[in-house]
């Protein structure tokens, strides 16, 4: 509640700024994250004493919508909402199969500094990381789901020409988990 109050006070204070301009935007692209499938396969192999084969996704889609508030021509603030597709892994052990799937969503807030056609940004995010796993043994399927939430930092940059942009953003600690980072490469437009 305190964070929301501070944000509302900040917006109220800044709306009187004569150079202020608010634009909306959308970005879409690919996000890479390491779901540590190799480590999981090794744990399963050690526990079962069997060879484990596995397949996993290294990337999935991500979309982001945002509001861009210009304090000046060089300094902006962005408030965004992002959502990813799922990263999946499948493990096979002599007649049994295990799967896991992860996706994320959240909000982010960043200060963006523009220099000519190049921009850099740094800020923070509050995100939720959702996981689902299933294990099939002898035709019986066992399932579990879990969600964690938390915050982390983000840094990125890119090129913006004529209200279109191409960029890269690194999100740390997705869902508050220190081992869950992601890299987002995108194409976007500002309206």
Q: Model-found features: residue ranges?
A:
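Cleavable N-terminal export/targeting peptides
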Residues: 1-23
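Short glycine/proline- and aromatic-enriched beta-strand/turn motifs that initiate or cap beta-hairpins
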Residues: 19-84, 113-117
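Outer-membrane beta-barrel "beta-signal"
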Residues: 21-25, 29-32, 113-115, 159-163, ...
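Transmembrane beta-strands of outer-membrane beta-barrel proteins
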Residues: 25-31, 78-82, 121-125, 167-171, ...
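Detector for outer-membrane/organellar transmembrane beta-barrel domains
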Residues: 29, 78, 84-86, 94-99, ...
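Flexible, solvent-exposed loop segments that connect beta-strands
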Residues: 34-57, 85-104, 126-149, 174-178
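Residues that define the transmembrane beta-barrel architecture of outer-membrane proteins
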Residues: 57-63, 83-85, 101-107, 114, ...
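Transmembrane beta-barrel domains of outer membrane proteins
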Residues: 66-70, 110-114, 156-160, 169, ...
């Amino acid at each position: 509640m305190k964070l929301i109050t501070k944000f509302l006070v900040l917006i109220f204070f800044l709306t009187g700024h004569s150079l202020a301009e608010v634009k909306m935007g959308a970005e879409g692209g690919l996000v890479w994250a390491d779901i540590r499938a190799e480590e999981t396969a090794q744990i399963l192999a050690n526990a079962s004493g069997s060879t484990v084969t596995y397949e996993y996704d290294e990337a999935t889609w991500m979309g982001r919508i945002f509001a861009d508030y210009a304090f000046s021509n060089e300094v902006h603030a962005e408030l965004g909402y992002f959502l990813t597709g799922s990263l999946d892994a499948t493990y096979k052990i002599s007649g049994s199969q295990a799967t896991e799937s992860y996706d994320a969503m959240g909000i982010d807030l960043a200060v963006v500094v523009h220099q000519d056609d190049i921009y850099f940004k740094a800020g923070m995010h509050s995100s939720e990381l959702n996981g689902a796993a299933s294990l099939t043994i002898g035709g019986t399927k066992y399932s579990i789901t879990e969600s964690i939430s938390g915050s982390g930092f983000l840094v990125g940059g890119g090129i913006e020409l004529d209200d279109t942009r191409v960029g890269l953003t690194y999100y740390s600690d997705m869902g508050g988990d220190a081992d869950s980072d992601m890299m987002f490469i995108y194409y976007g437009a500002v309206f």
